[in-house]
Every structure is written in structure tokens, then in C-alpha cells.
Amino acid sequence: MTDRVTHRVSLDDLNLEKQKFDSKDDIKPWLQDNLQSTKGINVVIERSDTSKIIFKCKNKEKKTKIVESKKTASKTMIRKHTSCPFKIRANYSVRNKVWTLSIVSDEHDHVVDLPRSFVGKNLISNTIPGSSLNVLDSVAPRSNKKGIKPTSEIANTPSVTSYSPSCAVKRNEDVDAPKISSKKARNLTKKPSTQSTRSSSSSDGSSIVSFGSLTSQSSSTSLPENYKGQVPTSMDSMVVEESLTGKSLKPAASHPVKRKNMKANTMKKSKKLKQNPIVVSPIEEDSNLNSFDDANIDLQRQQSLQSPLSHLVQNQDPISLEQNPQLHTVYPQPRHSKQSSSLLKKNQQQDRIPDNMPLQPQENNRTLQNFPLNQFNANEILQNVQQVVRETVKSEILDSPNIDNTYKTDMMDSFVSSVILDYKDYLSSQFLFSLKQNLYDRREATHTNVDLEQNGSNENLFDEQPQHKHNHQHNENQFSYQSQIQNQRQNQNQNQGQNQNQNQSQSQTPGQNSNQNDSQTQIPLQSQTPQDRKSAMQQNWLPGSTPGVGGLIRLSPLLNDNDNNEYAAVAAAAVVGSTPGNPNGNSLENFTHLPGINSSTLNYLMQLPHPSANPNSGGVSSSQPASLMSLQGHQGLLQQQQQQQPMFSMQNSGQQLPPLSSIPKLPSSNNANVNLNSSSTLPLPLNNTGPTLNPSSLLKSTSRNSTNSGNINVNNINNSNNNSNSAFNSVFLNSSITTNPAFIFNSQGNPTNSNQSMVNSIMTTNSNKDGTATSNNNSSGNTSNNLLNDMPNYGPGW
């Protein structure tokens, strides 16, 4: 292994040992400022402790080959970390409580760059002070690629060199010294201190040589083969002429130029070329022209690509527009916001133009706009525009924390509509027609009434600005065709609605027809409101079912909540002739509107029609005057419809109710003791009525007739006897009792009379609620004719 060449830089002029610091943090900034500005050394902290800090040189030559073995079989040593021996130590004095500096080693294994303060100096002093005699030159030969110096170079090369602040150069050994073997060179490198003292004791005349001879020797040795492309050192780039008269030495060549200045020069060339752009085909372009590839040029390319698209958003990037004013003058923008980025890329190929190519005038740039765009370029343009618009909308509107969510939708609607209106002159008629078609389909989905005049006004949505006559006529023809299609759809919907009404009217029973005489006809499907359509769907969800009493759901009456047809059959049976002297006139006090019972078989239990409606009933007529019981309007018509109703309708498995006129009226007398006759018994329940009787139907209540049920009791008018109220009339006419279904089935009477406990409990409770005293609870009527004895026959549904 060969020895490394070391370079020593003197730090005596800085007087580091005399510096004292109170704080630990002040040491590194001070060292970096002084060493970098005067010596060109950049230091970093290698180790740090509470009482010491070790600074080392920040070597730029990391991971480079240093030495290589003579034998090819041995491994090559590669520097992975900084191996420069330069070190400065900072020690903390506990007694004095200050930090002091000490130089551990001022040697380097690499060439130290020229300090910043010496770059601009043009004069080099001729006089060399005595203190700088021990300072060695920094321009030393580097090892070659193999790390072994040739024998011809060893004789003429010093082992340790340095430079002083005054740039005085000194030789350690004589030029005509004999050849030094490699062993002696190794010994000299191991003892740099002895050589430095020897150099200080030598005389001035024998040690100082001319700069010309030094630079001629160092130029052949200081630049090895692997050291290519780097900036030469400060002494190599200077060729100093020494006058024979001993005058001051002046440099004959310019100072060394760093890479940063070289980049600046190349940038100036590229900027000059940008003023006169030339169209170059990508096929004819030379692939070897890569001399102007630079990061700054790439940055300008990106800015030039983004600047034409930045005008889509107002005030988005004013700085980029100001930085590139030439782009707007050289490349005029079209009327649209769509700029081809591929054309801009072709324009940017001017950066790779060779110097020998003649420049063309600026008028040739207009040929770029006449190039036809293929599908790839069009897609690229659309993607660029969409990306800019999406990012802008997302950042300015959607992701803006200052805008509420309620206003974001309005802003998006306004933005899209303004874009369409601004560029509608360049949109195709098919696109506008599709927009209008979608608009009309949307309105038909909401089932709003759309007239032809309104359609005409809506068709002018995009016609606010003048258009070409051809496009306008084409749009009118399409709109007329659209209106014809829409009228045909409306006619079809109306015909379907009429056919549906006819089918429903034919399938209805006479009882159902009576319920729908006063109802309106079915609204056409197109003019229906959402509520009407919802109710129609609820009524017609079963096949063959129609709204009304006949359209009930078979399992439970709870699912039939049609308020329009509620108790229509009850009202039809109750209304009779309007003349006061009609002996057959039926009254409302004989039945009441039970709230919540919708078309159930319990209806006939609570309705008490006149006995004359059924001549075979044999019931006792009531003694109340007919003038207090009659209603006004439509009695004759409803009575005729009532007589046409059949006794039972078995088509729906016992769901329809029997006519109310066939139900016998219970006797009403002044005697509270009720003795039922076999002729006045209620008809037997319908077949298979157990599953249809749901007790939850009694819990449903409506407020339509609840306030009138307790006011139509005529038996309470001008009756001197407090016990004149019939037991059953009180039960079925008093809203406070009938609203509680549990009252009918709870036995609260005398347990000794088990056969009449149900009826007696009802009578007792009713008389107590009305404030009367009824004590006749020991009636000995026919127990087999009790009203509620047949109640268990309705099945387990109760």
C-alpha cells in the first residue's frame, strides 16, 4: 500500500488557541465563518460531549478511490466516510468556565479549494514575510489512478506543500535534488513536522522559485487521469511573470472560474436563443445535441407549459405570467381556452439547436398554428385543460373552508352555466340538443305540467346570443320534433288513465259505486301530484282490487287506511228521506261513527237502522220524533242505491259488510230492564270471520266524528226519567265508553247472575257514568237471547 499525499494549511494567523467562548453553541458558527472565508475549509462536528467538541473537515470527495494495492488480487480500498486527518478540538475548562480551541491536525488528504476572499484579487505581493516561510503550498500533486507516482515525478514533486494568505510559494527541496525512493517518500510523509521546520530554516534565495517553473511542473502532475472536469486550484490557473528587476509579480491569465459561473454563461446563451425561436422537426434533430441540458432550462420548460393554461383561471398565477412575457408575444393565444401543449413542446426544442444552424425570422412561428391536430394531441389538450379546471375548482370552491356547503352547489351551477353560455357559439347543435333533451326528461320525471309555450321559452335558454341561421333552423326542427314526441306521450298517458278508470268502474260492486259517486275522476298520470300517485299505488297494489270497501286487504283491516272512503256505506245507510213526516225516516241517533273501525264486520253490531228497512225484522220502532233525526240533501238517491245492495257479498270471503238496512234495530224503551226477543236477535256472523277480526282495529281512532258521537243521542232530550237511556244505545252512542274496547268484554256485574252479568255490567257502568241510579240488575230475561252471548263465536282473533 502506498502512502497518501497530505496537504497542510496553516491556521496560525487565526490564533485559535487564544479564542475563548462562553457558550458551547457559539463555537461552530465562529469556526465556519473564519475557516470558510479565509482558508476554504468547511468544518462539521464529529463528536460532541459535555466537556469537549471535535471538529473535522467536511470532505467533498466521498466514496472515491484513494489508494489501490500493487497486486491485482488484493481488494481496493474505497472511502465510505470522511478520512481527512484535519481536526480541531474545543475543550471546556471547569475552573474558568470557558471554552478554548486547540488544533489537533491541520493536514488534509485532499486539495483545499480557494477561499472566497481570494477569488477577486488580481495582485500578488512580491515580498514574502518571515512568518510565512514555514507555510507550504497548497498546490500539490495528486496521486494518479493507481495511487503510485512515477519516478520522474517524484524527483520534482514536494511531499508536503501549503500556501500562505499572501500567496507566496516556497519549495521545500531543491529542484536539482536527487531522486527519492518510495521508502524515503514514505518517511517524509510520516514526519511532516520535521520537514516544516527544515523548510523554515532554509534561506529565501534558495527556496523561492519562479511561478512559471512551478506551474509548468505542477500542471503535469497535479491533474491525474481520474481528476477530470473539476475546477483547477488557485495556483494552477495563474501564470505569473517575474521581472528580472525584482518588480511585483502580475498574473498573466485570468482567475479560475467555478461551475456556477459556467452555468450562468450557458444560461445567457439559451436566453439569447429564445428571442429568435426556430422550428425544428423532431426527426431532423440531432440526437447528440445535449450540450444545453440543465435544471434551469427544465424549470423554464415547465413554466412555459403551465403559463398558457394559467389564463383559464382569473388571477391564478400572475407571477408566472410576469416572468414569461415573451411567451405571449411570440405565441399568440387563440380565442378559446384550449392551447396545445404539444406545440409548446415543439417550440421548446429550440434549446437544443446547434450553433452553426442559421437563425430564421419570427414569421416562421405562425406555421405552428397551421399544423393539423391528431387524436393524441387533442386528448392531451383536453386532459391538460380538465386537470387545470378540476384542480382550480377543487382548491377554490370545493375545498375552501370559507364557503358553506349550501353555497357550493349554487357556485358550481353558476360556473357551469356561465361556461356553456360563454362558449355556446362553438358548441355543436347535437350537444345543445342533448342538453335540452336531458332538461325536458328531468321535468317529466317530476310530473310537472309542461305546456308548449313554456317549452318554447325554455328552448330559448341557449339562444340569448345571436347564432348562425343554419344552426338556428336545425335546432328549431329538432325542437318541433321533440314537442311532437312529447304530445304523443301525453296522449298515451291520458288514454291509459281513461282505460284504467273504465276498468275500475266496471269491476266495482253496487256498494262500491255508491262510495265513489261524489269522488272525483282519476287524474291523468302525467298531471298527478306525487301524493296522488302514492295513494293510487296503495289502493291498486293488489290485482283486481279497487279503492273503496271492496278493495280491502284480506288479512287485516289496519292496512286499509283510506280516509276518503271511510264509512261511506255507513253514511249511505243512515241518510233517508228529507221530509219531516216520513214515517220510515231513519235517524242518526240509531247508530254512530265508531272512530278507527274501517270496514270491519263489527260495523253492523254498532249500527241500528230503522225496522222498516227490513220488514221481516219484527223490531220495535223508536218513539223519537222524525224531525229531530233527519238530515238534509241527497237522501233519495242514496236510499235507492242502498236498496240495490245485496244482503251478503261472498266474493271476497266475507270481507264486505251486509246492507245496513237488513240489520234490526234494538228496542229502546223507558224501562232500563231489557228483555230481548228472538225476533230481534242480530244475524249470525259471516263465515270465516275470525281471521278478519283484528282487535287492533278498535284502537285506531279518528277525530272526524268523535265529537258528534256523544251529541246525537236523542233519547236524552226532554226525558223525565233518568233511566230512560237504553243500555245498548248508551253503550254504542257514548264516545267515552265505546272508545274503550276492553269495556265490552270485562264483566263487572253481580256474580250471582252469571247469565246476565255481561249486559248488566254494561248497564250499571253506563248509568253511573251518566249520573243516574239504576238498581234493576236482577232482570230475568231470556239468557239465550243475550247480545254478547254470540261474541265468542268470532274466533280466537279477539
From Swiss-Prot:
Residues 193-223, 476-517, 657-695, 705-718, 774-789 have a biased composition (Low complexity). It comes from the Eukaryota. It holds the Pfam family AFT. One of its GO terms (molecular function) is DNA-binding transcription factor activity, RNA polymerase II-specific. GO terms for biological process: cell adhesion; cellular response to iron ion starvation; cellular response to oxidative stress; cellular response to starvation; filamentous growth; filamentous growth of a population of unicellular organisms in response to biotic stimulus; filamentous growth of a population of unicellular organisms in response to starvation; intracellular iron ion homeostasis. InterPro entries: AFT. Coiled coil: none annotated. GO terms for cellular component: nucleus. The keyword Transcription applies. The keyword DNA repair does not apply. Residues 142-274, 331-365, 449-545, 642-718, 748-798 are annotated as: Disordered. Signal peptide: none annotated. It is found in: Nucleus. Residues 153-165, 449-460, 518-543, 646-656, 748-773 have a biased composition (Polar residues). Its main location: nucleus. Transcription factor involved in iron metabolism, oxidative stress, surface adhesion, hyphal development and virulence. Functions as a negative regulator of MRS4 expression through the CACCC AFT-type sequence in a gene dose-dependent fashion. Acts as a repressor in flocculation, plastic adhesion, and surface hydrophobicity. This is Iron-regulated transcriptional activator AFT2. The gene is AFT2.
